[in-house]
Amino acid sequence: MTQGLILTKQNKGVSFKTLSRKRFIELELRQNKLGEQTLSERIIHNLNLTNKIIESCAQNGIGHYRLFPSLFPLLMDISLELNLATIKGANQILNLLKKIGATAMEHNVSLSFCPPILTANSSDGLASDNDDSIVKTVRQLDFYAHLFDLMGFPDDYSNSIHVYPHMATKDATQSNLEGIADRFYDGMVRCNDSVIKRLVVMNEKNTCWNCMNLFVYFHQYMGHKHRHIMPLSYDNLHDGANPSALQGKKVTTSQNIDAFAKTWPDNVTPVFHWGNKSNPLSYERPIIWENEKKDFLFPHNKVTPKSAKTVTPKKKATKKTTEPKPSVKKILKKIEKNVLKSTTFNHLYGQ
């Protein structure tokens, strides 16, 4: 089990900087490019802070960090016509992104991301029935996948991007749920390949997308119809608030963890979320458990890199030898076997 860190806004030791659209425009009107200069300085501050957090994770024995959702304020606002490649300080920003990637690989700290536009309460999403919302979502997903590329990471699930289905229905029939999964897939394939190869879906806390439905439609159904094997990310708090039941019996936490873990490629450690003070359940397969921290403090001592056995060379070797096709074929074979012999919900997670 690997401990993963999510920093909350309440953390007094961490202060990421943002910039409102109103303030940006005020600065631009006061002096040409002043708003852009201010924005650039705040992005640079956020990236330096991110690098410091990753170093601190290494010293605290934390092997994973979910990137702060607002590292790049306003860059997703199309009306401002801002571009990462041309913004003031672009070269410094690029170098800092490379530094973050190097620091994470040096200390064997993996990274993930959950875009702010795709939080659980967002009205946007890949399955939206509003094309403008889909365009907005695709733009943001492409941007954050590009950040991982600039950091030097392979385009795979070892640096995952987490989203929710977002589109829900009160009439959770097979037809309606399949329709949402189809729309999600259609939106997803509008993204760059570097998004598709990183995208994972999480169970929701108060919609039709509990663990069971997510597995059946986003993993099994999507794999069978669209030939895309979607990894699923488990959230224990959402599961507790929105449980699954099969034949009148509640599906247990252990069953959900086991099922979701098996949706990930064999050579990638699944990234799940554990949202209470108790320790996550132990599991035969290594799992990264993200957890919010309000009291995370930076150590004063210099971080000592981990041994060479766990640093960049191993990462490179993993990238070169990654062959997802056999795993995909194996899972598809299993899915097709179940589809032929079962009706919806007539089995427990493909068994």
Residue ranges and their predicted role:
Residues 1-110, 119-142, 146-157, 180, ...:
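Alpha/beta catalytic barrel-like cores
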Residues 233, 240-241, 269:
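Conserved His + Asp/Glu catalytic blocks
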Residues 114:
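Conserved, mostly hydrophobic/aromatic
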Residues 168-170, 205-208, 238-241, 279:
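Short, catalytically relevant binding-site loops at active-site mouths
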Residues 160-177:
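Glycine-rich phosphate-binding "P-loop"
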Residues 111, 232-235:
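Residue-level marker for buried hydrophobic side chains located in beta-strands
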